Structures are given as C-alpha cells and as structure tokens.
C-alpha cells in the first residue's frame, strides 16, 4: 500500500474519478467541458445510453457510441468505452465484433480500436482460477494490426503480462 501511495502521489491531482450512476452522455460531455481531460474512461459505456425515443435497444447503444465519439473529437480526448460481450462469447478464446452485447455493428462502427478480452473455458474439477487471458484486437484503425495476444492476468496488480 505505501508503494502504491507513493507512486500515486505525483499524479493524484490530475486524476478525477466521478460516480456516474444514473448519468447520461450529456453529463459526460459537461464533465469534459469542465475538466478538459486527455483521457476519459466510461465503465460501462452502455449504461450511459438513453433508450427513450428509440425503437430498439441497439439503436440507443449506437447513438450512445456516436455521442462518445463526438465527445472525443470535440474535446480532443481519448475515450475508452468499456462494454460487455454477449453470451455468444462464453467459453471462447477467439472473439469477434459480432459478440458485442446489445449492438453487434453500431458500437463497433464508431470505434477506432476494439480489444475483446477472453479467458479460457472452465475445466470441470478445476478449483484454481485460470489467469490466462486472450486479448483479441478485432478492429484497429490506428495501426491496422489485428490478432491475438495471449497473456497472464496478474490479479494482484491488475496487469496483463505477455
């Protein structure tokens, strides 16, 4: 704990954590106007979506992703929009965009980079948690590279090591 505190101290004043329970993307935009961040993490991005006025939930999620992208462009910041995978991804190591929860194409269309994280299927009788993870880069407008990186999750430090 003391090492973490020492490492955090120099950046503490530049990191803001906001409770966004019940908030929408308009609130996110107002926070960006007020604080002018370089990086915004939306965990879970889908929870900021307003479903009113949309015929289907996937349309609301697409509109939400579009709003997040516009915030990134207008406020010159990187927006990390966390989302969940659907049940289609359960037990699979190789993942693709169609396995996104709720919006199979709408959210993906707005992303510059998509990294989907998989873990090994459960093994019957295995008591120990499997820490192997598979980072699937399924969309990459930044460098063009697509593929998988197999790594270990160090849960004590929340780091992936390859």
Task: Place the predicted regions along the sequence by residue.
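Flexible beta-alpha connector loops of hexameric P-loop NTPases
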Residues: 16-18, 49-62, 91-98
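Phosphate-binding/switch region of NTP-binding enzymes
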Residues: 64-162
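Helical hairpin unit composed of two closely spaced alpha helices linked by a short loop
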Residues: 38-78
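Cytosolic-facing regulatory segments adjacent to core modules
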Residues: 1-36, 50, 148-150
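Active-site-proximal loop/turn and secondary-structure-junction residues that shape catalytic pockets
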Residues: 21, 46, 85-87
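Alpha-helix capping and helix-coil boundary motifs
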Residues: 1, 24, 53-59, 126
């Amino acid at each position: 704990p003391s090492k973490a505190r020492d490492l955090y101290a120099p950046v503490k004043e530049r990191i803001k954590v906001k409770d966004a329970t019940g908030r929408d993307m308009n609130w996110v935009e107002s926070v960006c106007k007020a604080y002018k961040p370089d990086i915004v993490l939306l965990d879970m991005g889908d929870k900021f979506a307003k479903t009113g006025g949309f015929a289907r939930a996937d349309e609301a999620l697409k509109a939400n992703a579009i709003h997040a992208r516009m915030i990134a462009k207008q406020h010159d910041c990187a927006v990390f929009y966390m989302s969940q995978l659907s049940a289609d991804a359960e037990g699979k190591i190789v993942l693709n965009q169609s396995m996104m929860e709720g919006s199979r194409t709408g959210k993906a269309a707005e992303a510059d980079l998509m990294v989907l994280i998989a873990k090994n299927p459960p093994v019957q009788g295995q008591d120990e948690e499997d820490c192997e993870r598979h980072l699937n880069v399924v969309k990459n407008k930044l460098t063009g590279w697509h593929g998988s990186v197999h790594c270990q999750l160090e849960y004590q430090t929340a780091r992936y090591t390859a």
